[in-house]
Amino acid sequence: MADNTLRIKPVANTDRPAIGRFIASRWGATVIVHGTVFRPAELLGLVAVRDGRLAGLLTYDVSGDSLEIVTLDAVTPTGGVGSALVTAVADEARRRQVRRLNVTTTNDNLDALRFYQRREFRLFAVRPGAVDESRRLKPQIDEIGLYDIPIRDEIELVRDLAIG
């Protein structure tokens, strides 16, 4: 009988090869956010496992009083994996005494905007032309994105965390 329980665990060094392949298949080797080049396979992260298989992955970077979600991927959307990973990273942020979570998405990613706003994130900043600038570092970033919307801008969302 299969164990359908979703387990969330920190990324371990033994997970890195599989995570590297997973990230590369979805994002390429690098992700560029607000002009910063991240290598998600090398970042801190949380892995969601169901039935012994990778169900999702969240990678993040901690800087000062902020924990930035760099990537969030669920193998099967709308199955609760993304929500579970965001809840787990919020718990990790509180444990680290971090005051806020932030995430950046692109103007075409309406699904991400909906997802994060439904999980207590608020719009914080719009960076017009930021993706156009990122293409100088990563030319393979698509020009046209979801829903046939031209990808041009970054939108940052923030969730304040109650500490204590």
Language-model-derived ranges and their functions:
Residues 74, 103-112, 124, 128-135:
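Conserved beta-strand-loop-alpha-helix junction that forms the acyl-donor binding cleft
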Residues 33-35, 140-148:
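Short, P/G- and charge-enriched loop/turn segments at secondary-structure junctions
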Residues 5-7:
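Extreme N-terminal starter segment of soluble prokaryotic enzymes
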Residues 10-79, 83-87, 152, 160-162:
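Acetyl-CoA-dependent GNAT
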Residues 93-107:
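Conserved GNAT acetyl-CoA-binding A-motif
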Residues 79-93, 114-118:
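Conserved acetyl-CoA-binding loop-helix of GNAT-fold acetyltransferases
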